[in-house]
Regions:
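Acidic catalytic cores of enzymes that act on phosphate-bearing nucleotides/polynucleotides
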Residues: 1-57
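Glycine-rich, acidic loop segments that terminate in or are immediately followed by a histidine
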Residues: 1, 21, 52-168
Length: 168
């Protein structure tokens, strides 16, 4: 997630001294970046609750390479309603990187984030997919508002369909 996988490989192979020192520096920077992102998340207006989803607007503050980590941390924190999945996004050039997390209870009610993000991101000129409980996508940044509205509606429809079928 930092673009420095080679450092981890060298340390795992037994390299020490300068390599280990550099790896520790990268780890410290990564932790500081995560802490900054978590501080940002606690600000008013960064999280927005829609009808069926909770949106985390990472903008250009949350690093696109960390949006999935931040989404996982927040979704497991117990601070969000368990009745709605978290949809986090961050700017990635002219694209937006999206990371979605659901609760086990939502998956049991029929929510499949991987299927929804795969279908919707393709409709918006992007790509996406994943698992029922955790998924990701990338779409053009100028389409994010409409995408989130459609995703909010689609999550509601998917959950309602399963409840209507006696699954919830």
């Amino acid at each position: 997630k930092t673009g420095n996988a080679w450092l981890g490989i060298l340390v795992a192979m037994g390299a020490r001294s300068d390599v280990l020192e550099e790896a520790q520096g990268v780890l410290e920077q990564y932790r500081a970046s995560l802490a900054k992102a978590m501080d940002y998340v606690s600000r008013p207006g960064v999280m927005e609750e829609l009808n069926n989803i909770v949106v985390l607007k990472g903008g250009d503050v949350i690093d696109e390479r960390q949006v999935s980590s931040i989404a996982s941390i927040i979704s497991s924190s117990g601070l969000l309603p368990t009745s709605k999945p978290l949809i986090a996004f961050a700017q990635a050039g002219n694209m937006v990187k999206i990371s979605a997390r659901a609760t086990k209870q939502l998956v049991e009610k029929g929510l499949n984030l991987g299927a929804l993000l795969s279908r919707l991101s393709a409709e918006y000129g992007g790509k996406g997919g994943g698992h029922n409980i955790a998924a990701g996508a990338e779409i053009p940044s100028d389409r994010i508002i409409r995408f989130l509205a459609d995703l909010d509606r689609a999550v509601g429809e998917q959950l309602a369909k399963n409840v209507g079928a006696g699954g919830g």
